[in-house]
Amino acid sequence: MSDIDQLNTSLLAEIAAADDETALEAVRVSALGKKGSVSELLKTLGAMTPEERQSKGAAINVLKNAVTEALTARKTTLRQAAIDARLQAETVDVSLPVRSSPAERGRIHPISQIVDEITAIFADMGFSIAEGPDIETDYYNFTALNFPEGHPAREMHDTFFFNPDENGERKVLRTHTSPVQVRTMEAQTPPIRIIIPGKTYRQDSDATHSPMFHQVEGLVVDKKANVANLRWVLEEFCKTFFEVDSVTMRFRPSFFPFTEPSFEVDIQCDRSGPIVKFGEGTDWMEILGCGMVHPNVLRYGGLDPDEYQGFAWGMGLDRIAMLKYGMPDLRDFFNADVRWMTHYGFRPLDMPTLFGGLSA
């Protein structure tokens, strides 16, 4: 073994044995410093004959590169080990209260607040939360919800379609949260009482519409579910959500493929001022759609419509947030403007409760 090979073996062993960055730096200086062993070898290149420089020079450069790479790798390893050790030693008591600070704290987004409010209301009525995928199959988004072939919602101008897969099937960004109804009926034996908050997607964008928006809908399936039950649930929800003693509701006949009969629901309000006031006035405001679950949807969910019946309703979370809290433009919900969030957002500890008030 040549002297260069022996030096290479020795230096690599010293680098591997360095147990901290201080020791590693000492090895670097002894090898690559001004008077280091590798540096001294490099100085001899000028005194060598061309033949010696061709053979020994290449070996010395290989040695220098090997030592440099080993030093870099070892330094990275030591730094990562130091970080891991510090993380294991550090602890944060997350139960400690936040220190008072003049700095502005973050706010809860109105949509998150609205979801918490609605969840609190329906949880008090015995409902649970159900969720499903944002990327849906044509079957769950349309077919199982009784959308016939040729329905406008199946067209490209209204729905975001993915490219067909190897089987020719096109998945979609769900246009409503209703597919979760069918998934729940397939997986759960009645009685069913669920609400389904989530994101939905349609090709629409203006002051009151967004390509991505939020919906919440509810589903009740039982042997005796009926329109009277549906009306009571919606009345109790509206009174509690808008924090009024009473509401006057109007059910108008409508059409949805997945319900029969179907209704649009208006509630009486006062629209004379900049903010809509519910529980008073002589105006009407449409807030949601509802109806009895269509027998075909029950069948797709694996239930016998001769034994079970159900009712469902749905509304736009963004829209009812705008109505309740006087927000003029839906697009502001997604602009991440700190000034808007400071004005319309909620403090983190202002959790909605039925006892303390939803928007306290």
Curated annotation (Swiss-Prot):
Listed cofactors: Mg(2+)
Cofactor binding note from Swiss-Prot or TrEMBL: Binds 2 magnesium ions per tetramer.
Single GO MF descriptor: tRNA binding
InterPro entries reported in the protein's UniProt record: aa-tRNA-synth_II, aa-tRNA-synth_II/BPL/LPL, Phe-tRNA-synth_IIc_asu, Phe-tRNA_ligase_II_N, Phe_tRNA_ligase_alpha1_bac, Phenylalanyl-tRNA_Synthase, tRNA-bd_arm
Q: Which GO terms describe its cellular component?
A: cytoplasm
Q: Which reaction does it catalyse?
A: tRNA(Phe) + L-phenylalanine + ATP = L-phenylalanyl-tRNA(Phe) + AMP + diphosphate + H(+)
Organism's domain of life? Bacteria
**Record-listed E.C. numbers:** 6.1.1.20
UniProt-listed Pfam families: Phe_tRNA-synt_N, tRNA-synt_2d
Read off the CDD domains from this record.
Answer: PheRS_alpha_core (cd00496)
Entry similarity comment: Belongs to the class-II aminoacyl-tRNA synthetase family. Phe-tRNA synthetase alpha subunit type 1 subfamily.
Q: What is this protein called?
A: Phenylalanine--tRNA ligase alpha subunit
Q: Which gene encodes it?
A: pheS
